[in-house]
Amino acid sequence: MSENGLKEQITGKVEKTKGQVKEGIGEVTEDRKLKNEGKWDKTKGTIKEKVGKVKQKISDGLDNKE
């Protein structure tokens, strides 16, 4: 199992959650900039999470070949 992939998935989830919070606060306070920052953080988090999953699958596949 790839620790690096798992670490990246966790980092992605944290960043995605942070983005959701920022977006929500931006929505409530009508702060367009904060809302957009939140959307961007969510997107970055989703990408990191997916990259981590791919890394983990590749690592698991390589481990199974040995």
From Swiss-Prot:
Disulfide bonds: none
Superkingdom per UniProt: Bacteria
Protein name from the UniProt record: UPF0337 protein BT9727_0908
Gene3D superfamilies (UniProt xref): YjbJ
Disordered: annotated span: 1-22
Organism: Bacillus thuringiensis subsp. konkukian (strain 97-27)
Biased composition (Basic and acidic residues): 13-22
InterPro entries: CsbD, UPF0337_stress_rsp, YjbJ_sf
Similarity comment text for this entry: Belongs to the UPF0337 (CsbD) family.
Record's signal peptide: none
Pfam families: CsbD
